[in-house]
Design a protein with these regions (language model features):
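Acidic, glycine- and Ser/Thr-rich low-complexity intrinsically disordered tracts
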Residues: 456-530
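Acidic Gly/Asp/Thr-rich repetitive segments characteristic of extracellular carbohydrate-active
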Residues: 216-254, 515-523
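Recognizes extended acidic, P/S/T-rich segments that occur
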Residues: 66-101, 113-114, 162-191
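Beta-solenoid repeat scaffold
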Residues: 239-242, 253-285, 290-300, 496, ...
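Pro/Thr/Ser/Gly-rich low-complexity, intrinsically disordered linker/stalk tracts
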Residues: 22-61, 100, 115-156, 192, ...
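Right-handed parallel beta-helix
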Residues: 294-304, 323-335, 349-364, 376-392, ...
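Short glycine/acidic-rich loop motifs that flank beta-strands on beta-rich extracellular proteins
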Residues: 254-255, 282-287, 305-314, 335-345, ...
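Beta-strand-rich modules
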Residues: 95-117, 187-208
Length: 530
């Protein structure tokens, strides 16, 4: 009986299992939705003043697309579409005839050609057309220190100009009917030596944009044009005068030799500066500085090529006075016979500086390149300068011992490129003998010189930091002999590097082509890409 019951139960379970297998679902081979997919990957590309290209991904075959465009809209799709396109078969559509500098919303729907009830929902995107550019480029004469003249085709509609500095709105100036008719406006209220974006608007739509940099401050300045008697203007200037030079060549005429350049006597503290950074003025001649006057030069080329003498570019002539400042920045000093400056009287210069300046073609026949004999310079700075093709057989920086005048001169040479200067084994880069001197030498690139540092016991050991040297064999030789053949010190932290591969040293382009040298952060940065 037990066996019969067990067989009966097993048979029943087997029947149940067979019944379950027979109820399996059919294989799913397709999905039928109630509507088509909306276009995916919708993008607005290649915006111009009056066109846009829309692109999307096709969902499946046997569909077309409807495209609607709404102007001055940000995906609200309010009101009526400004453009409608139906029956579009491609998935790329270029739309033209749009309005410049305008916000648009676009939407695309998939149209099922077999069953309109299955049309998709909308896919949306927004974009802005490009602003126009009807501004004409201002000429050099259009740009002043506190204003700029902007022009565009006469009669083209516009309502205002807006002025931006660092993308911040500085001012908005409404246009008059006469200005619109003429296509010309003078934008006022600007600051000197400042970069602005000037934008032309018609309502809220931008029709033009130009970036300008105002020129040096001309407030109260004496304007000097090519052909003016610059020597007379300098010598008649009062304390605090600013001479603003237009581009061109300005000759300090020699008093005795016709056709030659001479010296202008600077007896009052003055500033000489170029007006246009794009057209740096050339001053042919030299300067004799008298009676404790300060002289500041900015954005000027000082050229001694036609001088009647080989004297230095700057010569301090009056003894027993204090000169507060001589400053040369953003400039170029070239083609002088004896040297760059000369202090051979018992006077003090509180600060003498060269900043962002190129100095070259200084022969040094009869003088050293930077030459102080009987005077005292409290602070001597060379910052981000390039000195090259100069001083073939003389010392580079010379400062004799005039320590009876007191003080402790501080010499700073930082971020400079010095190429081929004092290229003679008997000459020194630092012929400094003024007792108590302090020398700071940092971030410099020195190349192609046979010079030594100093063999003088009075030369302070410089504070060296992050300097690089190429082809400077004698700067590494330490013999420790006072007045010996080579050096009392060397730059122990300096790096001997490979050829910097200057872009065009022969023509004064010292952009560094050797990446290993460039990444050290040494040398003059005037050629760095901005």
């Amino acid at each position: 009986m037990k066996k019969i019951a067990l067989y009966t139960m097993m048979l029943g379970l087997g029947s149940l299992a067979l019944t379950s297998c027979g109820d399996a679902m059919d294989e799913i081979t397709s999905i039928v939705l109630d509507r088509d997919f909306a276009p995916i990957g919708l993008e607005a590309k290649s915006a111009t003043e009056n066109s846009i290209t829309l692109e999307w991904t096709k969902s499946h075959d046997d569909v077309t697309y409807t495209v609607e465009i709404f102007a001055d809209d940000s995906l609200s799709f309010a009101g009526s579409a400004t453009n409608t396109f139906t029956g579009v078969e491609a998935t790329k559509l270029k739309i033209i005839g749009l309005v410049y500098d305008t916000k648009y919303s676009a939407r695309v729907m998939t149209i099922d050609n077999a069953d309109a009830s299955r049309n998709s929902k909308w896919s949306n995107v927004f974009f802005r057309t490009s602003a126009q550019q009807i501004f004409e480029t201002p000429t050099e004469n259009d740009i002043a220190d506190r204003s700029v003249i902007m022009t565009w085709p006469a009669g083209e509609a516009a309502t205002s100009v807006r002025v931006y500095a660092d993308e911040s709105l500085v001012k908005e100036q409404a246009l008059t009917a006469d200005e619109v008719a003429a296509g010309k406006v003078t934008v006022t209220g600007l600051d000197p030596e400042t970069t602005y974006a000037i934008r032309l608007y018609n309502g809220e739509k931008q029709r033009g944009s130009k970036t300008i940099t105002t020129i040096a401050d001309l407030n109260g300045a004496t304007l000097v044009r090519e052909g003016d008697d610059i020597r007379a203007l300098i010598e008649a200037a009062e304390d605090g005068a600013v001479l603003a030079l237009y581009g061109g060549t300005h000759v300090i005429a020699d008093a005795e030799e016709e056709g030659k350049s001479g010296a202008a006597k600077v007896s009052k503290s003055i500033v000489i500066k170029g007006i246009y950074p794009t057209n740096v003025p050339i001053v042919k001649g030299r300067f004799e500085i008298l009676d404790g006057a300060s002289l500041e030069i900015n954005q000027v080329i000082i050229d001694g090529i036609d001088n009647s003498t080989t004297d230095q570019a700057f010569n301090f002539k009056t003894a027993d006075v204090t000169y507060p400042l001589m400053s040369v920045q953003n400039s170029e000093v070239r083609n002088f016979g004896k040297g760059v400056y000369y202090l051979n009287v018992a006077s003090t210069v509180q600060k003498l500086e060269f900043l962002n300046t190129k100095i070259h073609g200084i022969e040094c026949d009869g003088g050293d390149m930077f030459d102080c004999r009987k005077g005292r310079i409290d602070e001597l700075n060379f910052i981000n300068c390039a000195m090259y093709n100069s001083c073939a057989a003389r010392d580079f920086i010379r400062m004799d011992d005039a320590s009876d005048l007191g003080g402790a001169p501080v010499i700073t040479v930082d971020q400079c490129t010095i190429d081929g200067c004092s290229n003679n084994a008997g000459k020194r880069l630092l012929y400094v003998r003024y007792v108590g001197n302090i020398i700071k030498w940092s971030n410099n690139l020195v190349t192609n010189t046979a010079a030594k540092w100093s063999n003088q016991s009075k030369t302070g050991v410089p504070e060296f930091s992050n300097n690089a040297y190429f082809n400077c064999a004698n700067l590494n030789v330490l013999d420790g002999a006072d007045a010996g053949k080579t050096n009392l010190f060397i730059d122990e932290s300096g790096k001997a590097v490979g050829n910097p591969n200057f872009k065009d040293a022969a023509n004064g382009n010292f952009a560094i082509g050797n990446e290993d040298v460039s990444k050290l952060g040494v040398g003059c940065t005037l050629w760095n890409v901005k």
